[in-house]
Amino acid sequence: MTVLQPPSSVCYPLNLPIVPNPNLDEATRKKLTLECRTGAAVELARSGVFVHGGLTLPLNLTIINSLQLQKELILYFGKQKDRNADFKTLADWISPEIFFLDLISRTWQRINTTIDTTSENELNNGLSFKERLFHSMCFTESNIYIFGGLMVSPHNGYELIATNELWKLDLKTKCWSLISENPQITRRFNHSMHVLNENNENQDTKLIIVGGLDNMDIPVKKIDIFNLRTSLWESESKSDENPASKGSSKILVNIDGMPISLSHDSNFSVLIENNQAEIPTLALYYPQREANTSRRGTDDGSFSTYAHDLDDKSKLPKHHHHHHGDLKYFESDDADENAVKTLMSPIVILPLLGNSQGARMTSNPTQNNKENSILQVPFHLQYPSGNYFNYNIVVIGFYPDPQPSNLHCFIYNIASGKWIRVNIACTECSISMHRFWKLLIWKSHHQALLLGTRTDDFCSPSVQKFDHILSFSLPMLNGYNKLVNTKHTRTNNGIANSHNLNVNLSLYDHLPYSNSSTIEHTNPYTVTQGYSLDDSGIPRLTSTATSQFENYSRYITVPLEMESTSSIFPPYAMVLGKDALEIFGKTLSDFEFITADGDSIGVPVYLLRKRWGRYFDSLLSNGYANTSFNYEFNGDTSNIISFSPHTASKTTKFGNSSQSSNGSLEKYFSKNGNSKSNSNTSLKKPHSVDFTSSTSSPKQRAISHNKLSPSEPILCADEEDSRSNTLKQHATGDTGLKETGTSNKRPISTTCSSTGMVFRVPFQDMKNSKLGLSEQSGRSTRASSVSPPPVYKKSTNDGNDSNCTLSNTPLVYRRASTVGTTTNSSVDDGFSSIRRASHPLQSYIIAKSSPSSISKASPAEKAFSRRKSSALRFIASPNQSRQTSFASTASTASVVSSTSGRRRNSNQISHLGSSASLPNSPILPVLNIPLPPQEKIPLEPLPPVPKAPSRRSSSLAEYVQFGRDSPVASRRSSHSTRKSSSSDARRISNSSLLRNTLDSQLLSNSYGSDIPYEASIQEYGMNNGRDEEEDGDNQDYGCISPSNIRPIFSTINAININGNFKEGEFFSSKSYINNEKSRRLSYISNPESVESTNSNNNAIIELEPLLTPRSLYMPWSTASVRAFAEFFYTAQINGKWLLAPVTLDLLIMAKIYEIPILYELITEVLYKIISKKEEGLSVTCEALLNLFQQKVSRYCNENEGKIRKQLDSSESYQDTLEIKRSLANIDNGYVDSYLLRNTSMAQSIHYTDDSNGETEIDMHHTGISSIGSLANRAVPTVFAGGPRDSHNSIGSIAFPSNSGVQNIRRSVSLFSPATKKKSSLSRETDPLDTSDQFTDDVPDSGPVSRQQNFPRRSSSFTETVPTEPTRYNYQNLDSSKSNRASDDKEEQNEQATLQDISNFDKYKVETLQKRNSNDGKDLDRTNDPLKNRGTEIPQNSSNLETDPFIRDSFDSDSGSSFRSDSDDLDSQLGILPFTKMNKKLQEQTSQEFDDSIDPLYKIGSSTPGSSRLHGSFSKYIRPNSQREDGSEYVNISSLENMVSPNALPPVDYVMKSIYRTSVLVNDSNLMTRTKEAIELSKVLKKLKKKVLQDISQMDDEMRETGKPIFARGSSSPTLSRQHSDVATPLKQQENTRPALKFASSSPISEGFRKSSIKFSQAPSTQISPRTSVTDFTASQQRRQHMNKRFSTQTTHSTSALFMNPAFMPSAVNTGRKESEGHCEDRSATANRTNRKEDATTNDNDNIAPFPFFGKRR
């Protein structure tokens, strides 16, 4: 039984457009909604989906042609008698509307469009854009293009005719224009259209039109090409210009010269531009079928059999066809007896060259066996839909019939020709419940989307519905074996660069292989490799500054060498990010991460809020809420802010004064304050979405749209104008201020009286709040105006798009004004443009009426007015630099100031310091400076809540602002990740949330009323405008509960569902995370974070900068946190990052902290590592099988019968074949069922043993705390509430371990960790004695305890003959369930012991250090567990070693676990302890298990302090370490070295680390793949030993008979060494410590030894680690010494050695013999296989590996 690998898919409902008028007739209503379509055109562009046209009737079409369509229409209306009377023309039932789906909010919108009548194009005169169906649509450069389709005949309203019109919709103007109606172009429908050279600025953008039918239902075989720049049809113009070459430029859809037909319903085509040939190529899905087999079981007379008849008549030259069922093979004419019957693929490649011939691709040789049923489905898909993603074609289709349950998804890897099955089952419901009909690729988010309907409506896929979507992740594309058979390896024959139009392209010459080591093709923004060539192919000789910068960009932002990894941003954006990080990082930073090592890493808040998103906002809001709560309830005092009700009572004089934080950086780039802010700045991307104009429901969206035009989304670039059209205009009552214009605010500087430092409230614009500079210089300014939080409105004549504010708080609108100004006071507009974005501005105080208010000021005011504010100087002198103050170092991107046009305006966020100082506040925190009195409390009634258009109503503006040549014209950031639907969880108004908080009290008291909770629901729109009916329809997807409310800045205290306030209760981030995950479009953080908190349009009080958090403690190493911060700058995976701990840490951080794009990018890398492991296992299997076959052939004297009999009877050979089949199954997308069954059984036994084994474990005094529950076992240190003071503990988030606060603090964990049982380490006396007791007790503890404590290395290599020879060792796995259980038990014990060790106090650590240093010699001589292990080996294989952790912890070579403060990080959150890894590698090195270079530790394993190298990688960036040496550490274990094409497969403990990390992030697919690789590696090690033993036995027999042992051409010395090693007694190693040196039996290890022998055998490296712990300087010296050797010799020599293709077979094969976590075969026989593979694989074409990687140019 085959089981698919776990799915990564999630389903989401979509909000369909709302009917603008319920009284519309049925035909019109269906046009204006998306209930159903037939023949609509669908296209995904950036982060949205467009749908246009189509019949509004559900027609189940088995065949799509005009005749069949009209028949179905007649039948449909014949059944609908009530519609016959209303039927006038078919045009009534064809929609002309275009709809847009925002993938972020998952909401459909209808776009109101018009016909461009002002165009100079004569084609538009008198024309109307008619309804159509079965047309094609594409998107490029802010335009939508539509070609062809069926229209209603102008002469007959009942007839449909094809058209050849090409229309363009300009999304800027939303106007349709006809750009071509060339009669020479064939009319067609049911075709496809692609955009060529969209991202290549050096080539003209062209439209490629493929397939379809003409007016007579005859297939159109010609490909038409339209040049968008010249507006000419190239497919016709060239032949017209040159009659002699007429027809020469035509491109026909063909296979080997035989024309074929393509129809959109039966085939699909994708355009591949980034191939090695640099020739755009179409990949067509065109399956082969027998002539008598109709497409869908229909009559043979259908048109769809036409193409297959052609194909069956075509004769493939030079190949003979064979049939197996419906699958076709061809056999080469080569006389090679080993020629493989190759299955022909349904994928056809067709280069876009004149008269080029298409070629059908072949399938991967590993999938050619006729028993392989996986190929039956993708070769016979019905209603196929496909798309292209990074050298893979993702395909969905139905087989054997179009039932929803028969929908299959496959991935076709172009490089290897392999088909991989993908599980797309919905995790929340059965797949049969959903019906999907269309596949889309969301490239920016690495997601595949399936569009359809939630419930099965029993319609065929021709019926299109749009209410449900399924997404699944695409990083798994890296996780499959892509080895290509050497027979099909491409040759660099120059055809790719030849422009000979008549060349017949061979099958593999134009495969879209990855191109060069720079992998520029992986970046969707980079142009093709010919970007420096013009159309003539001549390199450009000119070099401009732009081209130089582009070259520099590509040089500095080289992605990882992975064929399926794409960058998020274009290179220039990443360069800007890198420069900002490395050059201006400190200058820009106003926030810092505090790492577990105590280091500080600066980063701008603006950047974090933009690209981290709502999770960071929640952290900020919680931190701000905690601070304000402490000020309010605990009376905490501060030097900056003091609580003085007396002072506050004097502040009423300037009650109208306001503070707002309208910190849009775009204002700086506005040419003047009144100009529209459409600036093309890199800070505001053209495709950025303004979340400030948002509502949370389609109801509000419809309301707001109707004010402009019915159901019309706002596509204008000025996204704020839409808000100004919908905001209700409110007067301000007794303020006496008339709203005559826009009142955009300038910030108010907050100045500390003691130091004069300017605490900058985020700056704003001052529109009508103008005050002349000369006048203002004579007026007093004040640091902080204390007033009720203002609410502003934006008038319709305001041009600035970043300053409109929405509010739902019970406040009135007030205009901003400066001190002593009236409504006509002004300040020079130039300030808004000359001021730097980072400059603090002078504080402006709003006077009530006239300048005379200054003269009436209180004495405090007058005293203060005599002081000139330093902020004034910033206005007067635009060249003034930033002040070195607390506030100025916190840049404009403060918590509230970092806003842009696409996020909320900060004047919605009030500063707590001011709001808390309102009258009637119980405690009034005010600045410790003289403050004026406050205004009287206004008594006017509260205005109604203004409503505004949807948050994403302007999202289409991201498509329309800039052309291709704009530097910001790239698609929106993939960090613009998904947020939960705006209608899901934002139904509780913020005003109700704030009811009992300090701010809400102030607000209610200010206006003399306290609004009841229920009233707030009704009056202030808790349901956000959703009516009862709508709520009822969507109750499945969202409910009103506090857990559904995202934490917001103003959320100071939590409320329960009844609105009751619980003192000290805050929103739980954990529940917030868990509840949000269910409805997001993939556990995604929304970088437009503030928008997500503001999408409910409720008021958000301004933040007080003095209370704003400015640092965040992150319990991770400095290296990990630095990489974490770097990602926000560059949005790229840095190849220099270490796999452990950095990358694995980042995976967990991305999951916990909700950064999904980071998660996707890291999983891509991890899948690539897994695939390299599986490739290595496959190569090892092939090598073993071929080696065994050669030996058997010699042994049987080439007698075929004897050879077959011998192979069939060889158990080891058959078992190896089983492993090969298992690897093939895994690579095809299935789970190995036998491994799965054994693993699940072992796990269940393990859980049963947990509670019972506790006493027994403690009996041995191992110091392992009892863990009795599955939850604690599955969740390691960090989440199980481990030692509070350890670096890894979540509880240490608030206090670094060196803060001295250990026992008195309470945990501030976001996850509320469970209480941990007391560690048994508290009663430990001496770890050395414990080790001795443990080893002494082992023989008497019985077999059960042996199994529990020694399973990890209970390999069978010590046995001469396996005690349990079993087929595939599966029975052995079954019989070793207790061993398997104890494997996991041991891992659990390691984690628990690491927790407890980290809980040691300094006294015990110092005692242990002293004792260990005193007992060093004795320990080396007598107490070495390694020696004890050696003496026990012959007695019992399970006693191969003592408990790994005990040995690692207490052995003299790794005793630093107790003595190094950095070793608390050794386990790194689920990763294997690095001391243990180091020990295993030392053994591996000494016994030479394999020739592979361990990517993590082989280099440093000879250095006793190597655990510091990686286990505590952050050591190198501790303040007292040499930071310059950091780059020298990361070479071997860096990602670029682990995933490069020539990298060696990872050793098993690397897989183990990935597996443990995948458990932490609960990634079932990643867990399954890694666990399978680990288990198969273990089994393969045992089988390798058995195979080599069988070979050795055959060699002995052959010696006795005098036969030659080695076949001609084999490397007999190497093989003989391997064979002799099998019988080598292990006693040679029993009494010797594993020397830290390389054995000299392998050429690879020899070469490596030469490069590293200087430090591997240096005397200093033999110093005991105990001395290095007590003397840190010595350790530093050793590391520096190693670094010098490492950087100068090792990297170069090993790179040169292993990049040599001659070494690749053996290098690959060695990757499976690595030291591994639970069952290592540390046999010296392992290297035999390496040498045999050296001898055999080089001579055997069938297994020569890596042609895909090795043939890179």
From Swiss-Prot:
The keyword Transcription regulation does not apply. It is found in: Cytoplasm. Residues 1399-1430, 1711-1723 have a biased composition (Basic and acidic residues). Residues 651-664, 690-699, 740-753, 774-783, 797-807, 1344-1379, 1653-1677 have a biased composition (Polar residues). Residues 651-753, 771-807, 875-915, 938-957, 962-988, 1312-1467, 1604-1686, 1706-1753 are annotated as: Disordered. The modification Phosphothreonine is found at residue 298. The keyword Aminoacyl-tRNA synthetase does not apply. One of its GO terms (cellular component) is cytosol. Residues 670-683, 880-900, 979-988 have a biased composition (Low complexity). Its main location: cytoplasm. Residues 938-947 have a biased composition (Pro residues). Keywords: Cytoplasm, Kelch repeat, Meiosis, Phosphoprotein, Repeat, Sporulation. Transmembrane segments: none annotated. Kelch repeats lie at residues 143-198, 206-253. Negatively regulates early sporulation-specific genes. Seems to exert its function by positively regulating the Ras/cAMP pathway. Required for growth under alkaline conditions. Acts synergetically with MDS3. Present with 815 molecules/cell in log phase SD medium. This is Negative regulator of sporulation PMD1. It comes from Saccharomyces cerevisiae (strain ATCC 204508 / S288c) (Baker's yeast).
